[in-house]
Amino acid sequence: MASSSSSSHRRLILAAAVLLSVLAAASASAGTSCVPGWAIPHNPLPSCRWYVTSRTCGIGPRLPWPELKRRCCRELADIPAYCRCTALSILMDGAIPPGPDAQLEGRLEDLPGCPREVQRGFAATLVTEAECNLATISGVAECPWILGGGTMPSK
């Protein structure tokens, strides 16, 4: 009877360990998904929105560029390196996060007299040394797929 109890106890511990491993893996992968609401906040980079439109089109709040840049860079730095270019893509083109009531979010608005391609070109450089000096997963100094060049790497 003791060996039967011991065997049941071992099976229970093994099952619990497997369950914990599965939960840990699911939790880790959820934290690394570059989608709004997970590794990227919903409607990401509001300060970068202002910084991009201010620098490219002269539209935005009456804050000096260095202050807008500081805020933008802080928001971008808070996003994991492997999601920064994705966050900038969402800034330009938007994304529909997972969920039953999900709607397009994060997209920089079309502004009269402010060409979208000019904004896109500047947004692609926000991770560069001249702007925020931040690392990305691509290993290049900017996010070229925002401009339509290359494909976005996955983690």
From Swiss-Prot:
Residues 1-28 form the signal peptide. Keywords: Disulfide bond, Protease inhibitor, Secreted, Serine protease inhibitor, Signal. The keyword Disulfide bond applies. It comes from the Eukaryota. GO terms for cellular component: extracellular region. GO terms for molecular function: serine-type endopeptidase inhibitor activity. It is found in: Secreted. Gene3D superfamilies: Plant lipid-transfer and hydrophobic proteins. Disulfide bonds join 34-83, 48-72, 57-114, 73-132, 85-143. Residues 139-155 form a propeptide. The active site is at 62. SMART domains: AAI. The keyword Signal applies. InterPro entries: Allergen/soft/tryp_amyl_inhib (IPR006106), Allergen/tryp_amyl_inhib_CS (IPR006105), Bifun_inhib/LTP/seed_sf (IPR036312), Bifunc_inhib/LTP/seed_store (IPR016140). Potent inhibitor of mammalian trypsin and a specific inhibitor of factor XIIa (activated hageman factor). The sequence heterogeneity suggests that 2 genes exist for this inhibitor. The genes may be alleles, or multiple loci could exist. Monomer. Belongs to the protease inhibitor I6 (cereal trypsin/alpha-amylase inhibitor) family. This is Trypsin/factor XIIA inhibitor.
